[in-house]
Amino acid sequence: MPRRIALIDLVGLSPALIGPHTPAIAAFAREKGGVRTMRPTLPAVTTSVQTSMLTGVGPAEHGIVGNGWMDPASGEVALWKQSDGLVQAERLWDTARHRDPDVTCANICWWYAMHTSCDTVVTPRPIYKADGRKIPDCLTEPADLRDRLTRALGPFPLFRFWGPAADITSTRWIADAAIKVERDTTPTITLVYLPHLDYGLQKLGPDHPEIPQHLRELDHEVARLLEHFTSRGVEPILVSEYGIVPVTDAVAPNRILRDAGLLYWREEQGREMVDPGTSGAFAVADHQVAHVRLGRGGLARRDEIAALFASTAGVAQVLQGEERAAAGLDHPRAGDLVLVSDRDRWFTHDWWHDDAKMPDFQRTVDIHRKPGYDPRELFVDPAIRFPKLAIGSRLIRRKLGFRTLLDVIATDPTLVRGSHGRIDQGLGWDGVLVADAAANLDDEADGRVPCTAVRDLALGTMFG
């Protein structure tokens, strides 16, 4: 019978942050022989690195080239899709079943949790009402688990999971759910995703004086999980996908493409709307990486576009051809050009020059409509003098049945103080691996362990 394991993802935790404010994590690391620094696959973003850890291969093979991409068939950009069918490589639990068909897996909020071969699933899934309301909820497998979790823990705290109010509440709910699911189902593999650090580090930056409190809050939840799992004979493995570094400003590649006459946009009732599929080129911005897809009008201008970005302040690399392949992104979903920002920059999806003409959804939390990742959704616009009153009045209008936008989100990219996505942030600022056998893993030349080694480490822990 395989040894049971729990793979716990402490998003945003880097070796530089482990210390006096994380006593439980630090003690566990000492017990396991120390903290190993992990080298992420490019891009170092949630869905890509999680999938690399679970499959043992990089994006060129598993196909998850970012948190989203432009579909060449539809010409549409889609981020944060959840179907397991998007992953094009076998994942940990299915690989383990080749050795023991009785292996079971519980996925508590890791990505691509829908339509999956996992036995138990808990994943955020809001209810979207026709009148524009977004109701906090989760999707589970089996279906009745949702009702049991809601009765025991309350509804999934969606607005504490992402947005200006994000805090430890969502991480605590996930930890509670993981404990309940493990106790009730005793899975062979338990995956747990704890997002708390991710938001504070992006919002405040890793050097902010409030970060020690965020670390203590996370450490408390990790301590509960470690105590639970070890008492149940489950071997914990701590990982994080990436570390988060300080940033000062953003680069807007779609504005550059627009100024070069390559972006297709039109004015709709005073708002400038873009059509990525019709554009000669469009950049899908994803933290510190942007995938630039070239359309009919852009393919013939590839070298010109590459040179344009290479000369842009804040852009560190423009990958194409053999360089793109060497970076592990030789996949049809990846951009024809892949941009990597400077260490202190990130990419926005913005294409408008006049904020009065931005899309109406830009000042809302709308992760599916925006054709790029937008960490400004963590901020209420500081220009709003009475933010609680502004939000409350809009919520009252919604409750009265009026279709009302919660258009209170900031648009200033300089508010964002932390980002990730690059794979060479500097030692101390990458992801971590803490596990029994981690000390025996082979290093790369820079002393880091590739994140793709996690799958085989997990299998080795299970089967010896």
Where are the model-predicted features located?
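Secreted, luminal/periplasmic, and some membrane-associated catalytic domains
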Residues: 3, 17-20, 36-39, 44-45, ...
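Beta-strand elements within well-structured catalytic alpha/beta cores of enzymes
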Residues: 2-16, 28, 53, 96, ...
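His/Asp/Glu-rich, glycine-adjacent segments
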Residues: 57-205, 217, 279-284, 288-294, ...
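Histidine-centered active-site/metal-ligand motif
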Residues: 199-204, 242, 420-427
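Short glycine/proline-rich, acidic loop/turn segments that cap or connect secondary-structure elements
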Residues: 416-436
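Short, solvent-exposed loop/turn segments at secondary-structure junctions
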Residues: 12-15, 43-44, 59, 110-115, ...
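Short, structured active-site-proximal loop/turn typified by the sulfatase FGly-forming signature C/S-X-P-X-R
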Residues: 16-61, 104-106
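Charged substrate- and nucleic-acid-binding regions of tRNA-handling and nucleotidyl-transfer enzymes
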Residues: 433-447
